[in-house]
């Protein structure tokens, strides 16, 4: 035991002495300062070999054996600050043109990169790593301090100078060595940005010298920002292999920087800091006041212990003088002393915090803020689109230079720069308004500067990455992706309010693509529900995403009442398996088309989006728990975050009427603490009033609900299940009706596989036998045999009766009931589609219209005994030798779903139900749209659902769009939709066959039309001569009478003429002359009939007139071209004289005829 104590007391050798000796000898041989000139560094005789040996030691010892001994020895020997940096200075001042010195400078750069490489905590760390880790962190901070601030020496510019020759070489001529030099230069810049003092270790020197502000100022002063801008803007042309390194540099530069503070001027930033300091002082004073209430006095420094007698006669011991104040303080002290040793789940070990800590703020001074803002603005103008487009493509194809952490960096950096772009626009607008200029004079740039992350490819990549991260529970990646998605939504929202019409249209398109996918809606909901202690950063990101997504989706669904979403889980896709080519007739082709149309119709019916139904999905206990966990940080939350939580609870309690979800003891206690304390919210904040009113209303509703449902007192202790929610809300259990299975879809045999009844029966029996249901086929055969015997007996009886009574009519055969032999057969008669098809093929019929289990099936009276025997014989043959087909001809695959004709007609007439919300709908088109829209095909369904935003007039001032403006825009879009629907010519009336020509069919058609005209002309002449009107004429007269009464007057005729096609005006001009003559002659005949006929009824007079009016067009069509002998009848003067002579005769208003495809279309034939 004494030996162990002695061994423990001895000094532990942290590094092998031999290794230390070798490394020290190499550092000494490298060079040093001359005694004569202490400021001048002198290289050793073999300095280049020493540098290469040191690099070899780092690679072969530290990296190979996973140790840090060589790095520790180099840090103790002060290699970087004592040798490498002076060598850089020597090369910069004297040896830039020397090839030897350039090689030495490059060797120093090769050493600096591994020595400054970020130290990461990972699962493979050894004891040696943990031993050297703190020291190396201190050493790297000293390296960074020497590189950033070393008097007037610009080491960063020196490093850039080393890589300039390689940058000047064109990419096609660049060698591997040039790419390596560029990579070393960028990696060193990345390392300098990443290195930061460890907060857990004592600071060595001034922390400001190595802070983020010092790094940014040094980058600005030594042209590092200019280098980054140059490479980012040309990343696709000259620096395609350096895109990922540039992304890492940008990520570590902007990580944790507050965008809003960055784009403030000095006065605003100073005021912001003053407000923050004032808030902190108020919090401190509040804590002091709380403490002063229970602080011990100078005479009360003795211990205090009291017993608290509880309601159950038990006694608890509480210590401390603060319990003497009152009973409430005593009970609170008891609650604070309670501890629940909740089992903590095993935390997943996080490899590194360099790329994870998004929430830790980075404080910048005014100079650094100004320099970084200038760089960010220039980067947005020139380098944003090239860099992020190239990086996204590299991430998608998983290039060799890409590591998994780069995806997280990509999404976070995109989110940060999108937020910066919106902040820059807001700052430009604010400065413009401060100068007193109207908004219309502000020349705003479009959002094309950030268009590379708003395209469809980026959205697809983002959605796929979010789903992968969520499935693999990679919460840090999901955190960055949620931030990116939120910033894209906010950017699109700002684009909708842009003054540029192009931005508005792009925003409309992006929203349509985002909200069209129902998987996106489900993913946002699932992220909210799956929060389980992932940290405040993740909690902030997921609550912000759900808040923004819900608000934008609600606004978009109100603006687009016909919004539809695509649900891939519900879509019924057609089986696209290749089939053997076989000749199909026209009926089969039409059946296939009908199947496609019916499939598209089913999908469209499932795409209708209901926002209330979607918002109700967020009304569950898991989502409430997520926002409750977020609200527990109310003392650290800002106004926007508090408003976010307030809006969610308001939506739950009042919009969705689900306030029961909030009736839980811990939630109510949290609300009460936020308002009444201890540690309540600051009452001077504007959001405090809104929270106070919300809490008051929630508690008031809870008290009313307790009066109605006393069981709620018990339920306050627990989370609410769905059944409990329904009972507490409505006072009774949910009435659940037993689910009734519907009858299966009706099947049929594919017409290309079988045409005769025998073949169809063979296929169906083969399918049933392959399914193991031969007993059902045997049952059908037995039923047919029994029915044949019974039918044969009845026929013999009828023959005997007819022989006895000569001439007696034959009575119809009675129907024979089809009875199942057991309950399983009874169920199969309803649920087995193949059996139902077989029963239909053999001639069985179902009685009644209701198709339910146990419905009666009968053998109809039309089937004789011979027919039944023949069918039974066919079934027996198929059952003895069932048709099984082969691999390519499976009888089960020869069956398909049967569609009813009315389904096809309904499918053709289906259109989108657009509710315009106005009683004036259809004023321009009284009977609604003339044609329904074409059915959507699967290929263009997403594109057809896009609605193009109407161009808006530029407004004078840019202000937040109010509800009245949004309502006016919605009405304008509705009017535009109505006008567009009135002009639609549907596929229902326009087919490709209209363009084809068939001379024989045309000849037959024209002959038939000529025959109809002659028959119609004969009926007209008969009616004019005899005054007798047949039934056909009367029907036409009634239609003509209604048409005459509804279209009397010149103005009505003109409006009706305007609704007709304007393309027929030229053709109709020549027909007016013929129409005038026809009217004159018909009026003359009517006058003669009135003179020669005795007094008749008014109805007969009307018939006479309506005959002339209704048939005058056909009469003129049957006549030959007008002869000169009848010219006087067509003169306007004669027509006027006839009208003057017969003043009592009604005068018909001339109407222009409508022509379509060369034929007269009467208005009644529409």
Curated annotation (Swiss-Prot):
Region annotation Disordered: where it falls in the sequence: 333-358, 564-594, 881-981, 1023-1145
Keyword line: Cell cycle, DNA damage, DNA repair, DNA replication inhibitor, Meiosis, Nucleus
Transmembrane segments: none
Pfam families: TIMELESS
InterPro entries the UniProt entry points to: Timeless (IPR044998), Timeless_N (IPR006906)
GO cellular component terms listed in the entry, alphabetical order: replication fork protection complex
Chief location: nucleus
Location of this chain's protein in the cell: Nucleus
BP GO annotations: DNA repair; DNA replication checkpoint signaling; meiotic cell cycle; replication fork arrest
Presence of the UniProt keyword Cell cycle in the record: yes
Record-level Gene Ontology MF annotations: DNA binding
Protein origin, superkingdom: Eukaryota
Compositionally biased region (Basic and acidic residues): 881-893, 966-981, 1109-1142
UniProt biased composition (Acidic residues): 585-594, 916-926, 1087-1107
Function: Involved in chromosome segregation during meiosis and DNA damage repair.
Similarity comment: Belongs to the timeless family.
Protein name as catalogued: Topoisomerase 1-associated factor 1
UniProt source species: Aspergillus oryzae (strain ATCC 42149 / RIB 40)
Top-level taxonomy: Eukaryota, Fungi, Dikarya, Ascomycota, Pezizomycotina
């Amino acid at each position: 035991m004494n030996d162990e104590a002695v061994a423990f007391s001895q000094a532990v050798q942290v590094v092998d002495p031999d290794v230390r000796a070798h490394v020290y000898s190499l550092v000494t041989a490298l060079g040093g300062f001359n005694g004569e000139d202490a400021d001048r560094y002198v290289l050793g005789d073999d300095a280049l070999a020493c540098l290469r040996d040191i690099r070899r030691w780092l690679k072969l010892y530290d990296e190979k054996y996973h140790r840090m001994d060589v790095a520790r020895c180099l840090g103790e020997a002060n290699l970087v600050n004592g040798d490498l940096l002076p060598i850089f200075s020597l090369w910069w001042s004297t040896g830039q043109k020397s090839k030897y010195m350039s090689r030495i400078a490059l060797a120093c750069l090769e050493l600096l990169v591994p020595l400054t490489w970020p130290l990461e905590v990972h699962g493979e760390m050894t004891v040696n790593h943990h031993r050297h880790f703190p020291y190396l962190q201190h050493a790297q901070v000293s390296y960074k301090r020497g590189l950033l601030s070393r008097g007037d020496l610009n080491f960063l510019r020196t490093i850039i100078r080393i890589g300039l020759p390689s940058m000047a070489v064109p990419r096609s001529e660049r060698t591997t060595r040039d790419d390596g030099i560029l990579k070393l230069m960028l990696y060193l810049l990345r390392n300098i940005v990443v290195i930061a003092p460890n907060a857990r270790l004592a600071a060595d020197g001034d922390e400001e010298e190595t802070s983020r502000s010092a790094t940014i100022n040094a980058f600005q002063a030594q042209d590092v920002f200019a280098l980054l801008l140059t490479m980012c803007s040309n990343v696709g042309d000259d620096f395609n292999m350096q895109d990922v390194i540039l992304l890492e540099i940008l990520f570590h530069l902007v990580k944790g920087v507050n965008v809003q503070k960055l784009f403030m001027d000095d006065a605003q930033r100073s005021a912001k800091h003053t407000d923050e300091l004032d808030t902190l002082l108020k919090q401190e004073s509040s804590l002091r006041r709380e403490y002063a209430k229970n602080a011990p006095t100078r005479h009360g420094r003795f211990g205090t212990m009291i017993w608290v007698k509880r309601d159950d006669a038990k006694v608890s011991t509480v210590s401390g003088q603060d319990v003497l104040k009152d009973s409430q303080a005593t009970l609170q002290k008891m609650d604070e002393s309670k501890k629940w040793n909740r089992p903590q789940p095993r935390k997943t070990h996080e490899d590194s915090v360099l790329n994870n800590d998004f929430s830790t703020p980075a404080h910048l001074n005014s100079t650094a803020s100004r320099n970084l803002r200038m760089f960010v603005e220039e980067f947005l103008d020139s380098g944003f689109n090239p860099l992020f487009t190239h990086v996204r493509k590299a991430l998608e194809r998983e290039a060799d230079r890409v590591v998994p952490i780069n995806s997280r960096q990509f999404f976070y950096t995109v989110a940060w720069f999108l937020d910066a772009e919106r902040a820059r626009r807001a700052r430009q607008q604010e400065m413009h308004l401060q100068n007193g200029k109207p908004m219309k004079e502000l020349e705003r740039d479009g959002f094309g500067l950030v268009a590379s992350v708003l395209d469809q490819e980026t959205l697809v990549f983002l959605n796929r990455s979010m789903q992968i991260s969520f499935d693999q529970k990679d919460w840090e990646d999901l955190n960055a992706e949620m931030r990116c998605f939120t910033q894209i939504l906010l950017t699109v929202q700002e684009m909708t309010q842009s003054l540029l019409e192009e931005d508005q249209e792009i925003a409309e398109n992006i929203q349509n693509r985002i909200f069209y996918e129902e998987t996106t809606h489900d993913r946002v909901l699932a992220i909210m529900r799956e929060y389980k202690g992932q940290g405040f950063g993740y909690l902030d990101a997921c609550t912000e995403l759900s808040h923004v997504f819900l608000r934008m989706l609600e606004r978009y669904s109100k603006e687009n009442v016909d919004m539809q979403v695509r649900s891939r889980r519900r879509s019924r896709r057609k089986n696209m398996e290749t089939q053997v080519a076989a000749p199909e007739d026209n009926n089969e082709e039409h059946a296939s088309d009908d199947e496609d149309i019916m499939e598209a119709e089913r999908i469209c019916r499932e795409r209708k989006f209901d926002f209330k139904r979607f918002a109700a999905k967020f009304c569950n206990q898991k989502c409430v728990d997520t926002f409750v966990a977020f609200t527990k940080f109310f003392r650290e939350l800002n106004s926007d975050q508090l408003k976010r939580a307030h809006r969610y609870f308001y939506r739950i309690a009042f919009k969705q009427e689900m306030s029961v979800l909030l009736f839980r003891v811990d939630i109510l206690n949290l609300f009460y603490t936020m308002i009444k304390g201890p540690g309540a919210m600051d009452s001077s904040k504007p959001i405090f009033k809104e929270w106070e009113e919300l809490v008051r209303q929630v508690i008031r509703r809870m008290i009313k609900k307790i009066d109605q449902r006393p069981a709620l007192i018990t339920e306050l202790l627990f989370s609410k299940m769905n059944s409990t929610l329904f009972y507490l809300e409505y006072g009774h259990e949910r009435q659940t009706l037993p689910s009734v299975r519907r009858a299966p879809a009706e099947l049929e045999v594919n017409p290309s596989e079988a045409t005769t009844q025998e073949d169809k029966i063979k296929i169906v029996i083969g399918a049933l036998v392959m399914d193991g249901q031969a007993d059902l086929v045997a049952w059908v055969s037995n039923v047919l045999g029994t029915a044949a015997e019974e039918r044969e007996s009845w026929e013999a009886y009828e023959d005997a009766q007819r022989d006895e009574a000569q001439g007696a009519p034959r009575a119809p055969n009675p129907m024979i009931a089809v009875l199942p032999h057991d309950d399983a057969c009874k169920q199969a008669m309803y649920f087995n589609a193949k059996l139902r098809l077989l029963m239909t093929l053999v001639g069985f019929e179902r009685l009644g219209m209701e198709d339910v289990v146990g419905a009666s099936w009968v053998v109809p009276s039309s089937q004789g005994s011979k027919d039944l025997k023949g069918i039974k014989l066919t079934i027996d043959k198929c059952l003895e030798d069932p048709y099984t087909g082969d691999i390519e001809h499976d009888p089960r695959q020869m069956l398909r779903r049967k569609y009813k004709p009315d389904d096809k007609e309904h499918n053709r007439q289906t259109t989108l139900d657009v509710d315009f919300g106005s009683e004036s709908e259809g004023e321009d088109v009284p009977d609604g749209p003339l044609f329904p829209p074409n059915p959507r095909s699967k290929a263009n369904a997403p594109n057809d659902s896009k609605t193009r935003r109407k161009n808006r007039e530029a407004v004078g001032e840019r202000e937040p769009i109010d509800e009245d403006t949004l309502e006016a825009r919605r009405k304008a879009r509705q009017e535009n939709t109505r006008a567009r629907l009135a002009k639609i010519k549907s596929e229902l009336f326009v087919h490709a066959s209209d363009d084809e020509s068939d001379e024989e069919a045309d000849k037959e058609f024209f002959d038939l039309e000529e025959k109809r005209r002659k028959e119609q002309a004969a009926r007209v002449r008969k009616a004019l001569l005899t005054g007798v009107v047949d039934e056909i004429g009367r029907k036409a007269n009634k239609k003509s009478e209604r048409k005459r009464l509804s279209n009397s007057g010149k103005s009505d005729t003109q409006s009706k003429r305007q609704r007709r096609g304007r393309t027929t005006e030229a053709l109709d001009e020549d027909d007016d002359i013929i129409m005038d003559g026809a009217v004159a002659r018909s009026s003359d005949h009517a006058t003669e009939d009135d003179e020669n006929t005795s007094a008749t009824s008014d109805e007969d007079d009307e018939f006479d007139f309506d005959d002339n009016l209704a048939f005058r067009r056909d009469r003129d069509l049957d006549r030959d071209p007008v002869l000169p002998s009848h010219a006087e009848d067509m003169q306007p003067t004669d027509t006027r004289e006839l009208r003057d002579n017969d003043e009592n005769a009604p005068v018909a208003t001339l109407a222009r005829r409508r022509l379509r495809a060369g034929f007269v279309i009467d208005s009644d034939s529409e």
